[in-house]
């Protein structure tokens, strides 16, 4: 008689039990979970794995777009996750209609959360009370008055971009405008944040900090994807390569050192953010050193990515739509005799320029996916639909902005849809669906500055050059996305406009 080995029975039993557990969990998620009433593919409702794979591949944005086109305004994209493109629901998510009832951020999704040993948090990761205090301190740095004081800096780097782009195009026959807009926006914001430029436009080369930012952002997107699984925080941290951890800390130290050097100068006449913050500190209302460090990294990334992405996209979209380019160029060149006349006061009245910027933000939102919010124990309501506690909810920007339910010819670039009286074809467009800077009490503090920067950059650039898209960049806009679009080089040829003297 053969000897009985318990392991011969235990192993199949264990496998069967584990398989049974996952099967029962999947069945519960699909048919009995509180979110089962929302439409979406059953595979996504059953398990976190499908959407996680899409996120790790950079395909979340395209996936959300396809799912909303098929299932409508609300789509269940994972067992406990809901994506919406409903404009009214977006106001509930962000607290635009009632700030007290906004759904809190899902801090598991933010890699900057709890990154410092002292527990310091910045605007991005602070709870609502701390966010209100910090935002009140920073708000004067983004006011109209502050922007007027910063205008000489903005003009300085805009003029330098125009000059350097022309030199590069003449030398190589083409120039990468993604690189140029990155250099200009980082130099300007660094001067505002640290009181000194990074000198990227002068040297015409990436420094290690800027060269690695895309890798850091991609890392944070992947970390968010993995952390959506229970108990994966510690496991993920152990799997992070030492080289990636080192780069992350180098980024933190780079910003900290720049802030420390700036603070040594105390209050100055230089129109940067910290002069205003230090004045608040003198009144006993300011930030701790840790809060200054934490926010400096945020400003140097978030405040540059929006404008750089928008400018790159606008350059591409205008080149691909020569009739729109001509209309904009005629407006700019017909209004100004020189670029010196272009200011933060003289540019806002240009209607078609503003319409192009708004349409650029719609077609190519800088943050195309959804920034997650997590429902508290009290539950929440989205446009009359009840959500259970712990639900993660997104407003899917790209999917909403490219929805045929919201816009006529949604995938095409038509600035005219933003006219005060739009053509009849676009009269029923749902322009309220477009909120690229978010909404509510935690909307982007720098949106006013971003608009002024975009107007000045685009106006001076197109006043000076005729722009021709290179063949190798014809499909530039087809991109992966890890929180932001993964931008490839955008090569154009620049032809300086010759004017009669």
From Swiss-Prot:
Its cofactor is heme. InterPro entries: Cyt_P450, Cyt_P450_CS, Cyt_P450_E_grp-I, Cyt_P450_sf, Cytochrome_P450_monoxygenase. Disruption phenotype: Abolishes the production of radicicol and accumulates 14(15)-deepoxy-12(13)-dihydro-radicicol, also known as pochonin D. Glycans are attached at residue 212. Its EC number is 1.-.-.-. It is a single-pass membrane protein. It is found in: Membrane. It comes from the Eukaryota. Keywords: Glycoprotein, Heme, Iron, Membrane, Metal-binding, Monooxygenase, Oxidoreductase, Transmembrane, Transmembrane helix. GO terms for molecular function: heme binding; iron ion binding; monooxygenase activity; oxidoreductase activity, acting on paired donors, with incorporation or reduction of molecular oxygen. Heme binds at residue 444. Belongs to the cytochrome P450 family. Cytochrome P450 monooxygenase; part of the gene cluster that mediates the biosynthesis of radicicol, a resorcylic acid lactone (RAL) that irreversibly inhibits the HSP90 molecular chaperone, an important target for cancer chemotherapy. The cluster encodes only two apparent post-PKS enzymes, a cytochrome P450 monooxygenase (radP) and a non-heme halogenase (radH) that introduce the epoxide and the chlorine, respectively. If this cluster includes all the genes required for radicicol biosynthesis, the remaining structural features of radicicol are presumably generated by the PKSs rads1 and rads2. This is Cytochrome P450 monooxygenase radP. The lineage of its organism: Eukaryota, Fungi, Dikarya, Ascomycota, Pezizomycotina. The gene is radP.
């Amino acid at each position: 008689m053969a000897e009985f080995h318990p392991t011969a029975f235990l192993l199949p039993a264990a496998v069967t039990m584990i398989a049974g557990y996952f099967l029962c969990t999947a069945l519960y998620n699909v048919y009995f979970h509180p979110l089962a009433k929302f439409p979406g593919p059953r595979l996504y409702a059953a398990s976190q794995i499908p959407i996680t794979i899409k996120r790790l591949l950079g395909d979340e944005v395209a996936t959300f777009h396809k799912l909303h086109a098929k299932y409508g305004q609300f789509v269940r994209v994972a067992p406990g996750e809901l994506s919406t493109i409903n404009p009214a629901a977006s106001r509930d998510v962000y607290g635009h209609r009632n700030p007290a009832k906004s759904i809190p951020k899902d801090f598991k999704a933010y890699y900057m959360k709890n990154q410092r040993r002292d527990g310091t948090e910045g605007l991005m990761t602070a709870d609502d009370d701390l966010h209100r205090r910090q935002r009140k301190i920073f708000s004067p740095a983004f006011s109209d008055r502050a922007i007027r004081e910063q205008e000489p800096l903005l003009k300085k780097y805009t003029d330098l971009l125009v000059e350097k782009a022309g030199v590069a195009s003449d030398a190589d026959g083409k120039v990468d405008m993604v690189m140029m807009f990155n250099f200009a926006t980082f130099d300007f914001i660094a001067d505002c944040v640290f009181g000194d430029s990074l000198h990227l436009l002068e040297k015409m080369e990436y420094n290690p900090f800027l060269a690695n930012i895309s890798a850091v952002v991609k890392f944070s997107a992947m970390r968010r994807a993995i952390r959506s699984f229970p108990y994966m925080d510690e496991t993920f941290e152990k799997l992070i390569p030492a080289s990636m951890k080192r780069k992350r800390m180098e980024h933190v130290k780079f910003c900290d050192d720049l802030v420390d050097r700036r603070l040594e100068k105390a209050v100055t006449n230089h129109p940067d953010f910290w002069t205003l913050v230090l004045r608040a500190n003198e009144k006993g209302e300011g930030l701790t050193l840790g809060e200054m460090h934490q926010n400096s990294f945020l400003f140097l990334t978030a405040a540059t990515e929006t404008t750089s992405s928008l400018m790159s996209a606008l350059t591409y979209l205008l080149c691909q739509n020569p009739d729109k380019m001509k209309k904009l160029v005629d407006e700019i060149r017909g209004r100004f005799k020189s670029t010196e006349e272009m200011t933060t006061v003289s540019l806002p009245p240009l209607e078609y320029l503003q319409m192009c910027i708004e349409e650029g933000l719609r077609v190519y939102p800088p943050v195309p996916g959804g920034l997650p919010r997590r429902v508290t124990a009290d539950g929440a309501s989205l446009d009359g639909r009840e959500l259970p506690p712990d639900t993660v909810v997104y407003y899917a920007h790209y999917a909403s902005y490219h929805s045929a339910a919201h816009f006529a010819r949604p995938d095409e670039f038509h600035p005219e849809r933003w006219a005060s009286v739009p053509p009849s074809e676009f009269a029923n467009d749902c322009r309220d669906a477009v909120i690229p800077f978010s909404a509510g009490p935690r909307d982007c503090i720098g949106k006013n500055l971003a608009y002024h920067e975009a107007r000045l950059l685009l106006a001076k650039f197109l006043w000076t050059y005729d722009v021709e898209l290179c063949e190798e960049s014809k499909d530039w806009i087809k991109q992966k996305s890890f929180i932001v679009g993964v931008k490839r080089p955008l090569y154009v040829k620049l032809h300086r406009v010759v004017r009669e003297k």
